[in-house]
A protein has these predicted regions:
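A structural signal for short, well-ordered beta-strand segments and their strand-loop junctions
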Residues: 14, 41-44, 61, 78-81, ...
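Short mixed-charge
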Residues: 123, 127-128, 135, 166-182
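SIR2/sirtuin-family catalytic core signature
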Residues: 236-333
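Short, well-ordered loop/turn elements at secondary-structure boundaries
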Residues: 142-146, 180-184, 242-245, 271-272
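Acidic, metal/cofactor-coordinating or nucleic-acid-engaging core segments within structured domains
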Residues: 197-243, 287, 291-304
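Short, solvent-exposed loop/turn segments at secondary-structure junctions
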Residues: 154-157, 192-195, 254-256, 283-285
Length: 333
């Protein structure tokens, strides 16, 4: 018998390390490039992105950019125009991520803290909820632990910190019950710096009705189709890991609709014997005692709103979600 723990992380750990992996960092890089030889479609896209930053509802996260690209498809008359703009954005993003991936990490990084955080994510919960998780974990008190990280980031930062090669396993700290805990190779569901994937969850997010059903368009900008064409089984592995997870930890993720496939899977998993710890971050959130339940409800409802669960199922699932707000999780310097 084994216990399966899954971590789904995006970019907060990289931001904590001072790495410029946010959309706004790429935005400045992309619009700062020489545009004199750009095609008409690329120039129009850059102008759109520039104007977007002046809007109150401007893109803040990578998922906002992805949804925005789906909306922007109404500006294309044919597949060729779409590919011109999309491929330039994707190629420049690849260039940018390669630059970030080559940067030296801070010498002060505490790799042992990363190992502890991966081993005991429940340490950041309040005592009552920590006890509830402990009692839940007792079911696997004699089991070996398997830990998987699904990274939505393109860089190899985690591998560098942990000093592991691409296909290496490593031993984390023993479980709270003294059994082994193995971290398996990190899975990059959106690809890595040599072939980053950026796009949509499904065809309904393509707002150009004339291009929506076009097979080439779908294969260009729908992430599940891109993973399917790559035939690397990464998507199959992530699907299987979520379906068998006993504990899922979400850290640093904007819960964007362009990854709705995975939120739906987690919603389905919550119908079973599984728990989720959602590490939310909002420095503007005041942790007044009288507001704690409101805050928990807000983040639980946000996560559940991304699933396809019925209202009755959401009510049941809510009791299986734990919110950890503004913690020191993965603060390594």
């Amino acid at each position: 018998m084994q216990f399966n723990c899954k971590f789904k992380n995006e970019s907060c750990i990289y931001i904590n390390l001072g790495l410029a992996t946010q959309y706004e960092n790429f935005y400045r890089f992309y619009l700062g490039l020489d545009s004199s030889n750009d095609s008409i479609q690329v120039k129009k896209l850059k102008e759109h992105l520039k104007n977007d930053q002046d809007q109150e509802s401007r893109y803040q996260y990578w998922s906002d950019l992805e949804i925005g690209m789906g909306n922007y498809t109404v500006n294309f008359s044919n597949v060729k125009e779409l590919k011109e703009a999309y491929y330039d954005l994707n190629d420049r993003m690849q260039e940018y991520m390669k630059i970030i991936d080559k940067k030296d990490l801070p010498a002060s990084i505490n790799s042992q803290k990363l190992i502890r955080d991966l081993s005991y994510p429940d340490q950041y919960l309040r005592p009552l909820f920590k006890e509830e998780i402990y009692n839940f974990l007792k079911k696997w008190g004699t089991s070996v632990y398997e830990t998987y990280i699904v990274s939505f980031n393109y860089t190899n930062v985690l591998e560098k910190i942990l000093k592991i090669k691409e296909n290496d396993n490593m031993q984390l700290s023993n479980s709270r019950f003294g059994n082994s805990n193995t971290l398996y190779p990190i899975i990059h569901i959106h690809g890595k710096v040599d072939a980053p994937l950026i796009g949509l969850n499904d065809k309904n997010q393509i707002k150009n009705e004339l291009l929506r059903e076009n097979e080439e368009v779908q294969e260009c900008i729908i992430k599940p189709k891109l993973n399917e064409m790559l035939a690397h089984l990464v998507d199959v592995k992530v699907d299987n890991h979520i379906r068998t997870a006993n504990l899922i930890c979400i850290f640093g993720h904007s819960l964007g609709d362009t990854d709705k496939l995975w939120w739906n899977l987690m919603g389905e998993r919550l119908k079973t014997d599984c728990r989720i710890i959602y590490f939310a971050y909002n420095p503007k959130e005041l942790l007044r005692p009288s507001e704690l339940n409101n805050i928990r409800r807000k983040y639980k409802n946000l996560l559940l709103s991304k699933t396809s669960l019925t209202e009755s199922e959401k009510k049941d699932a809510s009791n299986k979600i734990y919110i950890a707000l503004n913690t020191d999780m993965f603060k390594l310097t």
